Amino acid sequence: MSTSNDPSNNASAGKCPFHAETPKQSAGSGTANRDWWPNQLRVDLLNQHSNRSNPLGENFNYREEFKKLDYSALKADLRALLTDSQEWWPADWGSYIGLFIRMAWHGAGTYRTVDGRGGAGRGQQRFAPLNSWPDNVSLDKARRLLWPVKQKYGQKISWADLYMLAGNVALENAGFRTFGFGAGREDVWEPDLDVDWGDEKEWLAHRHPESLAKQAIGATEMGLIYVNPEGPNASGEPLSAAAAIRATFGNMAMDDEEIVALIAGGHTLGKTHGAAETSHVGAEPEAAPLEAQGLGWHSSYGSGAGADAITSGLEVVWTQTPTQWSNYFFENLFKYEWVQTRSPAGAIQFEAKDAPEIIPDPFNPEKKRKPTMLVTDLTLRFDPEFEKISRRFLNDPQAFNEAFARAWFKLTHRDMGPKSRYLGPEVPKEDLIWQDPLPAATHQPSAEDIASLKTAIAGAGLSVSELVSVAWASASTFRGGDKRGGANGARLALAPQKDWPVNAIASRVLPTLQAIQRASGKASLADIIVLAGVVGVEQAAAAAGVSVNVPFTPGRVDALPEQTDVESFDLLQPLADGFRNYRRIEGGVSTETLLIDKAQQLTLTAPEMTVLVGGLRVLGANYDGSKHGVFTDRVGVLSNDFFVNLLDMATVWKAADDNAELFTGSDRKTGEAKYSATRVDLVFGSNSVLRALAEVYACADGQQKLVHDFVAAWTKVMNLDRFDL
C-alpha cells in the first residue's frame, strides 16, 4: 500500500492524484451532442426562461410591483441623467439624448412581424448576441449609464421598460412631444435561444434584399438592426439602398411614410462616431476580458471616448441643433448638393457641397463642421416615393412631428401585444389597429349561465373532435413573442382566419355555436368557442373513466371586422401546426422542427407539448380529419392509446412517400398495415428526450396522469391571451 513518504507516490499527502495537474475540463466543456448531431431536434428551446433562471421567483408580479413606482420621480431622474456627463464616457454636447434614443431604437428594432420574435419586450439587449452586435457598439455604455437609476428603483421598473422609457424621455428632453408610453415589458434572465438571427458565420455578412422578403430575419447584414448605412454591401449608392430599407422596415410592418419619419426623426438628434479606423477598437462585450466587467469595444485611439470615440466608423452630424428637435434634417437634405466622402475611419458618407460650417462640434464650442449625411439618408431624397414624403415633411413640419410620434410609438410598442398589457400614466387613449383592439365586454355570464351554455353545447350534436378542434383553432394562433393571436376576440369567425385551410373546421362548427350564442345572449362567441372545448375535453375524459372539471373563466369579447387588420392577421397563419398534423408548405425545415417552433410560440414546455399532441390525436383533432397518428380504435376518448401504441414493438414503421413525411406502421409478424403517421407523430418515439416523456404516459399508471396533464396544458393554451387573469 502506498504511503505519503513512499517516493513512488506522485500525489502529495492528502490530495487526490487526479487533481494533481492543471484542470483541462469543466462542466459543459467537451464535444457536445450538437457537435456530433447538428440536426438534433431542439427540444431544449422549450426549457427557456424557467423559474430556475429567474432570481425573483415564481410569485413575483411585475404589474403589482410597477404600481409602487413613483413614475414622475423616475422620469425626473432620467432627465437629470441625460445631462450628467460622465468622465468615463463623456456626453456629446453635454447630453446623452442621441445615445439613449439609439439604445431604445436598437432594442425595439429587432422585432419582425413574420414570427413575432425579437423586439424590446424582454430586455434582450443586455444579453448575447445583441449586446455584442456590431450595430450595438457603445450601447453597453448607455446601459451602464442607466444602472444607478435601475439600482435606485429596483424591481419596480424592468430593464426592458427602462431602456424604452429612457429613449422616450430623451426625445421629450429635446423638445419633442411623444405619442405616449406604455410600460409592461417583463425582464427575462437569459438570452432567447429561439430567435433565428441568420446562418452567417461572419459579422456583417451581406444578404440580398430579395431574400429578406422570404424569411423572418430583419436586417440586411448579420449583426445590423436594419441596413448598412453605407448602402447595400457598403456600395455607397443611396438609390440602391431603397429596396433594402423597404424590406427591413417592412418586416416590422412599417410603410413608406413611417420609414421616412423614423429615419429622419432618429437622425434629427445626436451623431455617429468614427474618429479613427475601427482597427483601434477591441473585443465586443462577450469576448472582452474579465476585468472589463461586461463592457466591450475598448478603443486604443486617444482617450477612446468623447471626441475620440469610434462606434460605427461613420462620423456624421445631421443637424445644427443635435440636442434639440428641429426640421433641419429635411432642410439640409434638400438645401444642399451632396458629395461622397469618407470618415476618418474610412467609412463612406456624404458631405454638403459648398455649405458653410454650421454644425457644432460635440466637444469644442469653437469648432464647426459642414452638414453630413449617411448614404441611406440620401435615399430619402433620391428614391421617388421617399422623396415625395420627405418634401411634404419639409414643407409641413407638424405633419412630420405627428408621423414620427406615431411611428416611434409603434416601433417601441409593436411587440407588446394588446393595449390591455400597457401600464403607467402615459398610455394613449387612442386605439391603434396594429394593437389588435377589442371592444369592451358586454357579457358577464354567471355560473348558472355557463352551466346552461354547456348543456346547450353538449346537446347540439357536435362530436368531441369538432368541439375540441374548433377551440384549438381559435386559441392556438397565439404567439408568445409579440403576444398576438389567441381565442379572445373570436377572430376565428372573421377574415382571414375563417378562410385558412387549417381552420376548415370553423365553417362546419361555428354556425352551430353562433346559434347557441344568439339564443342565449349571455356570453360572447369567443367564450362559447372556448367553452365548447371545455365540454369536449370533459366528455372525452369521462369516456376514459376519469371525471374532471376543466377550468373556464369567462370574460372574452368578440372583435369587429373593422378592428381586424386582415393583412396583419394573415401573418399568424401557421406554416405548420403539428398539434393538428398540418403543414402548409413542403420542404425546407423538418416538420418536427416546426412542431417545436409552434410549441415554443405557445410557451409550452416539452411535457405540455407531448401530452397535447398525444391527447389531440386520440380526440381526432387532425385538421383534415385524417387518421395520421390516430393510434386508437376509440376516437373521442381521452386515452393514452397514442403513446401505448406508438411505443409498441409489435409495430414496425416504414416511410410511405419519397419525402419521408408519411409513414405506415405494420404488424411486425404479419406485415398487415395498422397505422399511418407523420413525422410529428413518430418523433415522440424517435427522439430520445420526447420518447422519455412519451413513456411516462404509456405506462400502466399513465392514463389518469395523462388526463390531468392534458387538462392543465389545454387550459393554459385557452388562456394564453387572457392578460386580465
Curated annotation (Swiss-Prot):
The catalysed reaction is: H2O2 + AH2 = A + 2 H2O; 2 H2O2 = O2 + 2 H2O
Task: Name the cofactor(s).
Answer: heme b
Alphabetical list of CDD domains matching this protein: catalase_peroxidase_2 (cd08200)
Q: How is the cofactor bound?
A: Binds 1 heme b (iron(II)-protoporphyrin IX) group per dimer.
Give the sites of the cross-link named Tryptophyl-tyrosyl-methioninium (Trp-Tyr) (with M-252): W105-Y226
Where is the cross-link described as Tryptophyl-tyrosyl-methioninium (Tyr-Met) (with W-105)? Y226-M252
Q: Name one GO molecular function term.
A: heme binding
Q: Which InterPro entries match?
A: Catalase_peroxidase, Haem_peroxidase, Haem_peroxidase_sf
At what residues does the UniProt record annotate the site feature described as Transition state stabilizer?
R102
Q: What is its EC number?
A: 1.11.1.21
**Active site positions, chain numbering:** H106
The terms describing its cellular component in GO are:
cytosol
Give a yes or no for keyword Chloroplast in this entry.
no
- Biased composition (Polar residues) is annotated at 1-12, 23-32
Q: What class of enzyme is it?
A: oxidoreductase
Keyword list (alphabetical) reads: Heme, Hydrogen peroxide, Iron, Metal-binding, Oxidoreductase, Peroxidase, Signal
Q: Which residues bind heme b?
A: H267
* Alphabetical list of HAMAP family matching this protein: Catal_peroxid (MF_01961)
NCBIfam families per record: cat_per_HPI, PRK15061.1
- What does the annotation say about its assembly with partners? Homodimer or homotetramer.
Record family assignment:
Belongs to the peroxidase family. Peroxidase/catalase subfamily.
Name recorded for this polypeptide: Catalase-peroxidase
Q: List the source organism.
A: Klebsiella pneumoniae subsp. pneumoniae (strain ATCC 700721 / MGH 78578)
